[in-house]
Regions:
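Short acidic-glycine-tyrosine-enriched beta hairpin
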Residues: 75-93
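Ligand-binding loop in jelly-roll beta-barrel domains
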Residues: 90-115
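Glycine- and acidic-residue-biased ligand/ion/polar-headgroup-sensing regions
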Residues: 59-75
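Short glycine/proline-enriched turns and hinge-like loops at secondary-structure junctions
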Residues: 40-41, 58-60, 78-79, 98-100
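A short, N-terminal "cap"/entry segment at the start of jelly-roll beta-barrel domains
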Residues: 1-40
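Conserved short histidine dyad/triad with adjacent acidic residue
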Residues: 28-59, 89-93
């Protein structure tokens, strides 16, 4: 029989977000099923503190996220708000920032590459 894991978001233990080889200031994650060893497939919760900014990167596979709380602004000015579900197709290049902080659940299908 397979195992089942249940976590309440209030009980998560966040660690520095280091998907590009080094921690990014103001970005922390809790990996649920995400693993680079399986090709970067899986899910994690991402917490971005006010003023945090992701590195510019290109998507090797699909990346989707749901904004649980706060707002996230993409480099092109598009703002994603609480309740938005966003899909990036393979080949998409971008980076994001948050003025007031945000909490996302991220679904990855492939490892992003910094540019």
């Amino acid at each position: 029989m397979s195992e089942r894991f249940i976590k309440n978001i209030k009980d998560l233990k966040f660690k520095p977000f280091d998907n590009y080889g080094k921690a990014i200031e103001g970005m922390n994650c809790h990996k649920i099923s995400y693993d680079k060893k399986n090709g970067g497939f899986g899910t994690y919760i991402l917490k971005m503190e006010p003023g945090a900014k992701s590195l510019p990167h290109v998507h090797q596979g699909f990346e989707e996220f749901y904004v649980i709380d706060g707002e996230l602004q993409d480099v092109d000015g598009k703002i994603y708000k609480k309740g938005d579900f966003v899909t990036f197709e393979p080949g998409t290049e971008h980076n994001s920032l948050t003025k007031n902080g945000c909490l996302l659940i991220v679904f990855m299908r492939g490892i992003n590459k910094p540019i």
